[in-house]
Amino acid sequence: MHKTRLALSCLLGSLLLSGAVHAAEALVPPKGYYAPVDIRKGEAPACPVVPEPFTGELVFRSKYEGSDAARSTLNEEAEKAFRTKTAPITQIERGVSRMVMRYMEKGRAGDLECTLAWLDAWAEDGALLTTEYNHTGKSMRKWALGSLAGAYLRLKFSSSQPLAAYPEQARRIESWFAKVGDQVIKDWSDLPLKRINNHSYWAAWAVMAAGVATNRRPLFDWAVEQFHIAAGQVDSNGFLPNELKRRQRALAYHNYSLPPLMMVAAFALANGVDLRGDNDGALGRLAGNVLAGVEKPEPFAERAGDEDQDMEDLETDAKFSWLEPYCALYSCSPALRERKAEMGPFKNFRLGGDVTRIFDPAEKSPRSTVGKRD
Protein backbone atom coordinates (compact mmCIF):
# COMPACT_ATOMS: atom_id res chain seq x y z
CA MET A 1 0.00 0.00 0.00
CA HIS A 2 2.84 2.35 0.91
CA LYS A 3 4.57 1.63 -2.40
CA THR A 4 1.31 2.24 -4.28
CA ARG A 5 0.81 5.60 -2.55
CA LEU A 6 4.41 6.53 -3.25
CA ALA A 7 4.03 5.63 -6.93
CA LEU A 8 0.81 7.63 -7.20
CA SER A 9 2.44 10.56 -5.44
CA CYS A 10 5.38 10.48 -7.85
CA LEU A 11 3.03 10.23 -10.82
CA LEU A 12 0.95 13.17 -9.59
CA GLY A 13 4.08 15.21 -9.01
CA SER A 14 5.29 14.38 -12.49
CA LEU A 15 1.96 15.41 -14.05
CA LEU A 16 1.88 18.65 -12.08
CA LEU A 17 5.44 19.44 -13.11
CA SER A 18 4.62 18.64 -16.72
CA GLY A 19 1.60 20.93 -16.58
CA ALA A 20 3.65 23.71 -15.04
CA VAL A 21 6.29 23.38 -17.73
CA HIS A 22 3.60 23.42 -20.44
CA ALA A 23 1.96 26.48 -18.89
CA ALA A 24 5.31 28.25 -18.84
CA GLU A 25 6.05 27.59 -22.50
CA ALA A 26 6.08 30.81 -24.48
CA LEU A 27 3.47 31.18 -27.20
CA VAL A 28 4.90 31.20 -30.70
CA PRO A 29 3.68 31.92 -34.24
CA PRO A 30 4.13 29.69 -37.31
CA LYS A 31 7.76 29.40 -38.41
CA GLY A 32 7.42 31.92 -41.26
CA TYR A 33 7.32 34.73 -38.71
CA TYR A 34 10.94 34.03 -37.80
CA ALA A 35 12.17 35.19 -41.20
CA PRO A 36 15.16 37.56 -41.03
CA VAL A 37 14.97 41.12 -42.27
CA ASP A 38 16.31 41.66 -45.78
CA ILE A 39 18.87 44.46 -45.89
CA ARG A 40 19.14 46.72 -48.93
CA LYS A 41 20.74 50.07 -49.62
CA GLY A 42 18.76 53.28 -49.52
CA GLU A 43 16.71 55.43 -47.19
CA ALA A 44 13.16 54.85 -46.03
CA PRO A 45 10.49 57.36 -47.05
CA ALA A 46 9.80 60.17 -44.60
CA CYS A 47 7.60 59.04 -41.73
CA PRO A 48 4.03 60.27 -42.26
CA VAL A 49 2.20 62.05 -39.48
CA VAL A 50 0.72 59.62 -36.97
CA PRO A 51 -3.01 59.10 -37.57
CA GLU A 52 -4.94 60.77 -34.76
CA PRO A 53 -5.31 58.11 -32.01
CA PHE A 54 -8.97 57.10 -31.91
CA THR A 55 -10.04 57.48 -28.29
CA GLY A 56 -13.68 58.45 -28.83
CA GLU A 57 -16.81 56.32 -28.85
CA LEU A 58 -16.73 53.44 -31.29
CA VAL A 59 -20.17 54.24 -32.61
CA PHE A 60 -20.45 54.14 -36.40
CA ARG A 61 -23.13 53.79 -39.02
CA SER A 62 -23.25 50.44 -40.79
CA LYS A 63 -22.79 50.32 -44.56
CA TYR A 64 -25.82 47.97 -44.57
CA GLU A 65 -27.99 50.45 -42.69
CA GLY A 66 -31.64 50.01 -43.66
CA SER A 67 -31.04 46.60 -45.22
CA ASP A 68 -33.27 43.61 -44.53
CA ALA A 69 -32.31 40.68 -42.30
CA ALA A 70 -29.87 39.41 -44.93
CA ARG A 71 -27.73 42.53 -44.40
CA SER A 72 -26.63 42.46 -48.03
CA THR A 73 -27.85 45.75 -49.55
CA LEU A 74 -25.28 48.54 -49.48
CA ASN A 75 -26.33 51.96 -48.16
CA GLU A 76 -23.98 54.34 -49.98
CA GLU A 77 -24.67 57.34 -47.73
CA ALA A 78 -24.08 55.31 -44.56
CA GLU A 79 -20.95 53.75 -46.02
CA LYS A 80 -19.51 57.18 -46.81
CA ALA A 81 -20.21 58.37 -43.25
CA PHE A 82 -18.65 55.18 -41.87
CA ARG A 83 -15.48 55.52 -43.95
CA THR A 84 -15.07 59.18 -43.01
CA LYS A 85 -15.39 58.60 -39.28
CA THR A 86 -13.24 55.46 -39.21
CA ALA A 87 -10.51 56.90 -41.47
CA PRO A 88 -7.83 57.14 -38.70
CA ILE A 89 -8.34 53.49 -37.77
CA THR A 90 -8.12 52.29 -41.36
CA GLN A 91 -5.13 54.55 -41.93
CA ILE A 92 -3.11 53.02 -39.09
CA GLU A 93 -4.14 49.49 -40.09
CA ARG A 94 -3.01 49.91 -43.67
CA GLY A 95 -0.04 52.11 -42.83
CA VAL A 96 1.49 49.78 -40.24
CA SER A 97 0.99 46.79 -42.51
CA ARG A 98 2.67 48.59 -45.41
CA MET A 99 5.61 49.84 -43.33
CA VAL A 100 6.27 46.45 -41.75
CA MET A 101 6.22 44.75 -45.15
CA ARG A 102 8.58 47.38 -46.52
CA TYR A 103 10.90 47.06 -43.53
CA MET A 104 11.03 43.27 -43.73
CA GLU A 105 11.81 43.44 -47.45
CA LYS A 106 14.32 46.32 -47.37
CA GLY A 107 15.57 46.58 -43.81
CA ARG A 108 15.53 50.37 -43.65
CA ALA A 109 15.48 51.59 -40.05
CA GLY A 110 13.18 54.49 -40.83
CA ASP A 111 10.29 52.17 -41.61
CA LEU A 112 10.76 50.31 -38.33
CA GLU A 113 11.01 53.50 -36.29
CA CYS A 114 7.95 54.99 -37.98
CA THR A 115 5.93 51.83 -37.33
CA LEU A 116 6.84 51.87 -33.65
CA ALA A 117 6.16 55.61 -33.37
CA TRP A 118 2.65 55.12 -34.77
CA LEU A 119 1.84 52.15 -32.55
CA ASP A 120 3.37 53.76 -29.47
CA ALA A 121 1.33 56.93 -29.94
CA TRP A 122 -1.91 54.93 -30.04
CA ALA A 123 -0.77 52.84 -27.09
CA GLU A 124 0.09 55.87 -24.93
CA ASP A 125 -3.28 57.47 -25.65
CA GLY A 126 -5.18 54.25 -24.90
CA ALA A 127 -6.80 54.22 -28.33
CA LEU A 128 -9.62 51.78 -29.14
CA LEU A 129 -10.29 51.05 -25.46
CA THR A 130 -13.61 52.83 -25.01
CA THR A 131 -16.51 50.88 -23.55
CA GLU A 132 -18.97 53.01 -25.52
CA TYR A 133 -19.62 51.23 -28.80
CA ASN A 134 -22.18 49.73 -31.14
CA HIS A 135 -21.89 46.56 -33.24
CA THR A 136 -20.04 48.30 -36.06
CA GLY A 137 -17.70 49.91 -33.53
CA LYS A 138 -16.72 46.70 -31.79
CA SER A 139 -16.23 45.18 -35.23
CA MET A 140 -13.72 47.89 -36.10
CA ARG A 141 -11.91 47.30 -32.80
CA LYS A 142 -11.25 43.62 -33.46
CA TRP A 143 -10.34 44.18 -37.12
CA ALA A 144 -7.80 46.83 -36.07
CA LEU A 145 -6.30 44.61 -33.38
CA GLY A 146 -5.86 41.75 -35.83
CA SER A 147 -4.24 44.03 -38.40
CA LEU A 148 -1.83 45.70 -35.99
CA ALA A 149 -0.88 42.72 -33.83
CA GLY A 150 -0.63 40.55 -36.93
CA ALA A 151 1.90 42.90 -38.53
CA TYR A 152 3.79 43.40 -35.25
CA LEU A 153 4.34 39.65 -34.96
CA ARG A 154 6.77 39.77 -37.89
CA LEU A 155 8.92 42.26 -35.95
CA LYS A 156 8.55 40.49 -32.62
CA PHE A 157 9.68 37.08 -33.83
CA SER A 158 12.06 37.87 -36.69
CA SER A 159 15.41 36.15 -36.16
CA SER A 160 16.98 39.57 -36.81
CA GLN A 161 15.44 40.80 -33.51
CA PRO A 162 14.61 44.30 -34.75
CA LEU A 163 12.80 45.19 -31.52
CA ALA A 164 15.82 44.55 -29.30
CA ALA A 165 16.86 48.19 -29.50
CA TYR A 166 13.38 49.47 -28.60
CA PRO A 167 12.39 47.68 -25.34
CA GLU A 168 10.30 50.49 -23.85
CA GLN A 169 8.25 51.07 -26.97
CA ALA A 170 7.74 47.34 -27.39
CA ARG A 171 6.60 47.03 -23.77
CA ARG A 172 4.02 49.83 -24.13
CA ILE A 173 2.72 48.54 -27.44
CA GLU A 174 2.35 44.99 -26.18
CA SER A 175 0.65 46.15 -23.00
CA TRP A 176 -1.84 48.04 -25.18
CA PHE A 177 -2.41 45.01 -27.42
CA ALA A 178 -3.22 42.97 -24.32
CA LYS A 179 -5.73 45.57 -23.08
CA VAL A 180 -7.44 45.79 -26.46
CA GLY A 181 -7.46 41.99 -26.62
CA ASP A 182 -9.15 41.80 -23.22
CA GLN A 183 -11.82 44.22 -24.42
CA VAL A 184 -12.36 42.30 -27.65
CA ILE A 185 -13.00 39.20 -25.54
CA LYS A 186 -15.62 41.13 -23.55
CA ASP A 187 -17.16 42.39 -26.79
CA TRP A 188 -17.58 38.97 -28.39
CA SER A 189 -18.07 36.51 -25.52
CA ASP A 190 -21.27 34.72 -24.51
CA LEU A 191 -23.20 35.39 -27.70
CA PRO A 192 -26.14 33.12 -28.56
CA LEU A 193 -25.24 30.64 -31.30
CA LYS A 194 -27.59 32.30 -33.78
CA ARG A 195 -25.47 35.47 -33.57
CA ILE A 196 -22.04 33.85 -33.89
CA ASN A 197 -20.77 34.37 -37.41
CA ASN A 198 -17.73 35.66 -39.29
CA HIS A 199 -17.38 38.60 -36.86
CA SER A 200 -16.64 36.18 -34.02
CA TYR A 201 -14.10 34.37 -36.18
CA TRP A 202 -12.29 37.62 -36.93
CA ALA A 203 -12.38 38.45 -33.23
CA ALA A 204 -10.75 35.07 -32.55
CA TRP A 205 -7.93 35.85 -35.01
CA ALA A 206 -7.38 39.30 -33.47
CA VAL A 207 -7.17 37.87 -29.96
CA MET A 208 -4.91 35.03 -31.13
CA ALA A 209 -2.50 37.51 -32.75
CA ALA A 210 -2.51 39.69 -29.62
CA GLY A 211 -2.11 36.65 -27.37
CA VAL A 212 0.98 35.41 -29.18
CA ALA A 213 2.43 38.92 -29.51
CA THR A 214 2.11 39.44 -25.75
CA ASN A 215 2.53 35.82 -24.60
CA ARG A 216 -0.87 35.90 -22.84
CA ARG A 217 -2.21 32.35 -22.74
CA PRO A 218 -5.77 33.35 -21.68
CA LEU A 219 -6.06 35.21 -24.97
CA PHE A 220 -4.75 32.17 -26.88
CA ASP A 221 -7.19 29.88 -25.06
CA TRP A 222 -10.15 32.15 -25.80
CA ALA A 223 -9.30 32.20 -29.52
CA VAL A 224 -9.09 28.41 -29.57
CA GLU A 225 -12.45 28.15 -27.82
CA GLN A 226 -14.04 30.41 -30.45
CA PHE A 227 -12.62 28.13 -33.13
CA HIS A 228 -14.26 25.13 -31.45
CA ILE A 229 -17.60 26.97 -31.59
CA ALA A 230 -17.07 27.92 -35.24
CA ALA A 231 -16.15 24.37 -36.22
CA GLY A 232 -19.27 23.13 -34.47
CA GLN A 233 -21.36 25.37 -36.71
CA VAL A 234 -20.13 23.75 -39.94
CA ASP A 235 -22.72 21.22 -41.12
CA SER A 236 -22.01 17.89 -42.78
CA ASN A 237 -21.90 19.51 -46.23
CA GLY A 238 -19.57 22.34 -45.27
CA PHE A 239 -22.12 25.12 -44.85
CA LEU A 240 -22.30 27.74 -42.09
CA PRO A 241 -25.99 28.34 -41.23
CA ASN A 242 -25.45 31.91 -40.05
CA GLU A 243 -23.63 32.82 -43.27
CA LEU A 244 -26.40 31.26 -45.38
CA LYS A 245 -28.61 33.99 -43.92
CA ARG A 246 -26.75 36.48 -46.13
CA ARG A 247 -28.73 35.07 -49.07
CA GLN A 248 -27.13 36.31 -52.34
CA ARG A 249 -23.87 36.95 -50.49
CA ALA A 250 -23.78 33.60 -48.71
CA LEU A 251 -20.87 32.21 -50.72
CA ALA A 252 -18.89 35.44 -50.34
CA TYR A 253 -19.37 35.37 -46.57
CA HIS A 254 -18.43 31.71 -46.32
CA ASN A 255 -15.22 32.66 -48.11
CA TYR A 256 -14.78 35.67 -45.81
CA SER A 257 -15.03 33.36 -42.80
CA LEU A 258 -12.03 31.30 -43.87
CA PRO A 259 -9.07 33.72 -43.42
CA PRO A 260 -9.46 34.16 -39.64
CA LEU A 261 -10.28 30.50 -39.05
CA MET A 262 -7.24 29.36 -41.03
CA MET A 263 -4.99 31.76 -39.15
CA VAL A 264 -6.26 30.61 -35.75
CA ALA A 265 -5.74 26.97 -36.77
CA ALA A 266 -2.20 27.69 -38.02
CA PHE A 267 -1.25 29.53 -34.82
CA ALA A 268 -2.82 26.86 -32.63
CA LEU A 269 -0.86 24.13 -34.43
CA ALA A 270 2.38 26.08 -33.92
CA ASN A 271 1.65 25.76 -30.20
CA GLY A 272 0.84 22.06 -30.23
CA VAL A 273 -2.95 22.34 -30.57
CA ASP A 274 -4.28 20.64 -33.72
CA LEU A 275 -7.75 21.96 -34.58
CA ARG A 276 -8.07 20.27 -37.95
CA GLY A 277 -10.03 17.35 -36.49
CA ASP A 278 -12.69 19.52 -34.85
CA ASN A 279 -16.22 18.39 -35.77
CA ASP A 280 -14.97 15.66 -38.06
CA GLY A 281 -12.65 17.92 -40.04
CA ALA A 282 -14.98 20.93 -40.25
CA LEU A 283 -12.36 23.44 -41.39
CA GLY A 284 -11.25 21.35 -44.36
CA ARG A 285 -14.89 20.58 -45.21
CA LEU A 286 -15.75 24.29 -45.18
CA ALA A 287 -12.78 25.15 -47.38
CA GLY A 288 -13.59 22.39 -49.85
CA ASN A 289 -17.20 23.53 -50.08
CA VAL A 290 -16.16 27.12 -50.76
CA LEU A 291 -13.69 26.09 -53.47
CA ALA A 292 -16.38 23.98 -55.10
CA GLY A 293 -18.85 26.83 -54.77
CA VAL A 294 -16.56 29.23 -56.61
CA GLU A 295 -16.71 26.87 -59.59
CA LYS A 296 -20.38 25.97 -59.17
CA PRO A 297 -22.31 28.34 -56.88
CA GLU A 298 -25.72 26.71 -57.38
CA PRO A 299 -25.62 24.69 -54.13
CA PHE A 300 -25.04 27.92 -52.19
CA ALA A 301 -27.91 29.62 -54.02
CA GLU A 302 -30.19 26.70 -53.23
CA ARG A 303 -29.26 26.51 -49.55
CA ALA A 304 -29.41 30.30 -49.12
CA GLY A 305 -32.79 30.52 -50.79
CA ASP A 306 -31.65 32.94 -53.45
CA GLU A 307 -31.48 32.36 -57.20
CA ASP A 308 -28.10 33.95 -57.72
CA GLN A 309 -24.92 34.44 -55.74
CA ASP A 310 -23.05 37.75 -55.83
CA MET A 311 -19.67 36.72 -57.25
CA GLU A 312 -18.11 40.21 -57.43
CA ASP A 313 -16.13 39.85 -54.19
CA LEU A 314 -14.81 36.50 -55.33
CA GLU A 315 -13.27 38.01 -58.45
CA THR A 316 -10.61 39.65 -56.27
CA ASP A 317 -7.62 37.37 -55.76
CA ALA A 318 -6.83 38.86 -52.34
CA LYS A 319 -10.09 37.42 -51.01
CA PHE A 320 -8.42 34.02 -51.18
CA SER A 321 -5.44 34.86 -48.97
CA TRP A 322 -6.61 32.01 -46.72
CA LEU A 323 -5.14 29.60 -49.28
CA GLU A 324 -1.67 30.25 -47.85
CA PRO A 325 -2.34 28.96 -44.32
CA TYR A 326 -4.66 26.33 -45.81
CA CYS A 327 -1.90 24.81 -47.93
CA ALA A 328 0.41 24.94 -44.90
CA LEU A 329 -2.15 23.03 -42.83
CA TYR A 330 -3.30 20.56 -45.49
CA SER A 331 -1.82 18.69 -48.43
CA CYS A 332 -3.02 20.86 -51.29
CA SER A 333 -3.17 19.27 -54.72
CA PRO A 334 -0.64 20.37 -57.36
CA ALA A 335 -3.51 22.00 -59.25
CA LEU A 336 -4.56 24.07 -56.23
CA ARG A 337 -0.95 25.05 -55.53
CA GLU A 338 -0.59 26.20 -59.11
CA ARG A 339 -3.80 28.16 -58.85
CA LYS A 340 -2.59 29.74 -55.60
CA ALA A 341 0.69 30.75 -57.24
CA GLU A 342 -1.18 32.37 -60.13
CA MET A 343 -3.45 34.33 -57.77
CA GLY A 344 -0.70 35.39 -55.36
CA PRO A 345 1.39 36.63 -53.81
CA PHE A 346 -1.25 37.46 -51.25
CA LYS A 347 -1.16 40.61 -49.15
CA ASN A 348 -3.96 41.19 -46.68
CA PHE A 349 -3.54 43.93 -44.10
CA ARG A 350 -6.23 42.38 -41.91
CA LEU A 351 -4.02 39.30 -41.62
CA GLY A 352 -0.92 41.34 -40.85
CA GLY A 353 0.41 41.94 -44.36
CA ASP A 354 2.33 39.64 -46.67
CA VAL A 355 0.66 36.27 -46.07
CA THR A 356 2.60 34.56 -48.86
CA ARG A 357 6.00 35.46 -47.41
CA ILE A 358 4.89 34.05 -44.07
CA PHE A 359 3.46 30.74 -45.22
CA ASP A 360 5.12 30.08 -48.58
CA PRO A 361 8.35 32.13 -48.70
CA ALA A 362 9.64 30.14 -51.69
CA GLU A 363 6.73 31.46 -53.74
CA LYS A 364 8.16 34.82 -54.77
CA SER A 365 7.26 36.42 -58.05
CA PRO A 366 7.89 39.76 -59.79
CA ARG A 367 4.36 40.73 -58.73
CA SER A 368 5.31 40.85 -55.05
CA THR A 369 5.59 44.61 -54.81
CA VAL A 370 5.16 46.24 -51.41
CA GLY A 371 1.61 47.41 -50.79
CA LYS A 372 0.03 45.39 -53.57
CA ARG A 373 -3.30 43.80 -52.64
CA ASP A 374 -3.45 45.25 -49.17
Curated annotation (Swiss-Prot):
Q: Which Pfam families does the record match to this protein? A: Alginate_lyase
Name any GO cellular component annotation: periplasmic space
Q: What class of enzyme is it?
A: lyase
Subcellular location field? Periplasm
What UniProt keywords are attached to this protein's entry? Lyase, Periplasm, Signal
Q: How does activity depend on pH?
A: Optimum pH is 8.1-8.4.
Q: What is its EC number?
A: 4.2.2.3
Q: What is its main location?
A: periplasm
State whether keyword Calcium applies: no
Give the reaction(s) catalysed.
Eliminative cleavage of alginate to give oligosaccharides with 4-deoxy-alpha-L-erythro-hex-4-enuronosyl groups at their non-reducing ends and beta-D-mannuronate at their reducing end
Amino-acid positions noted as binding substrate in the UniProt annotation, renumbered to this chain: 62-63, 135-136, 253
Q: Where is the signal peptide?
A: 1-23
Single GO term (MF): poly(beta-D-mannuronate) lyase activity
> A Gene Ontology biological process annotation?
alginic acid catabolic process
What is the top-level taxon of the source organism?
Answer: Bacteria
Purpose: Catalyzes the depolymerization of alginate by cleaving the beta-1,4 glycosidic bond between two adjacent sugar residues via a beta-elimination mechanism. Splits ManA-ManA and ManA-GulA bonds, but not GulA-ManA or GulA-GulA bonds. Also cleaves acetylated residues. May serve to degrade mislocalized alginate that is trapped in the periplasmic space.
Name the family. Answer: Belongs to the polysaccharide lyase 5 family.
Q: What is this protein called?
A: Alginate lyase
Q: Which organism is it from?
A: Azotobacter vinelandii
